[in-house]
Amino acid sequence: MVKESAEILSEIRKNYILSTMKGGKRIDGRLPDEFRELTIIENYIPRANGSAYVALGNTRVVAGVKIEAGEPFPDTPDQGVLTTNVELLPIAFPSFEAGPPNDLAIEVSRVVDRGIRESKMISPEKLVIEQGKKVWIVFLDINVLDYDGNLIDASTIAAVAALRNAVVPASKEGGEDFKLPVSSTPISVTMVKIGDTLVCDPSLEEDQICGGRITVTTTEDGHIRAMQKGEIGAFTVEDVKKAVKMSLEVGKKLREKYFR
């Protein structure tokens, strides 16, 4: 009976969200292309080489950067290394459990990592200490503290903010510390389909009842650097065009406000 009541309530809530969307508004009053309130605090972890705390609505994440000297990959002896990891802490959401990364954590880490790599945000050739023998390895760790939808964008923003203030501890190798070389500011914008409408920065409820999810990562030069399709549902060619347009416009607004 409890399960049946929950299913009925869920269906009622879904219909309410859909009917509200038909009026051009979302259940929290936002417009389709409007992000929730965003807070970014840089240098959040004192002992990290770079860090940032991000609150996107009630979704909260912390990104930390640790940079150490190590061996390069055999196929890229003239480049530094970036490794990205996302951990969903059990305190963040009832279904999150300690242990190996689940599918959500793996997806978020891959999308964040791909956006950073494909945008050439980090200049890997500038992280070489001795070609073929020693390079700087950038460990990017993202911890989810609270989950209320849109982990991908919250994690991307935290990662970008942390990398932008990261310092390479070159003094440990006999040199002088220097800022991590970055050349762009990739921003991911995640959109879901509610009925026939695309909305960005989905809340948890919107994510749960959506008819498909798409994430587009762009840079300030107006180029698309990465795309990711998620959840069950299909997008038309027109939907994808709208998603790209929205991601470029929203990404530009976020950069101008938070990453000048």
From Swiss-Prot:
GO terms for molecular function: mRNA 3'-UTR AU-rich region binding. The keyword Cytoplasm applies. InterPro entries: ExoRNase_PH_dom1, ExoRNase_PH_dom2, ExoRNase_PH_dom2_sf, Exosome_comp_Rrp42_subfam, PNPase/RNase_PH_dom_sf, Ribosomal_Su5_D2-typ_SF, Rrp42_archaea. It is found in: Cytoplasm. GO terms for biological process: rRNA catabolic process. One of its GO terms (cellular component) is cytoplasmic exosome (RNase complex). Its main location: cytoplasm. Pfam families: RNase_PH, RNase_PH_C. NCBIfam families: PRK04282.1-1. Belongs to the RNase PH family. Rrp42 subfamily. This is Exosome complex component Rrp42.
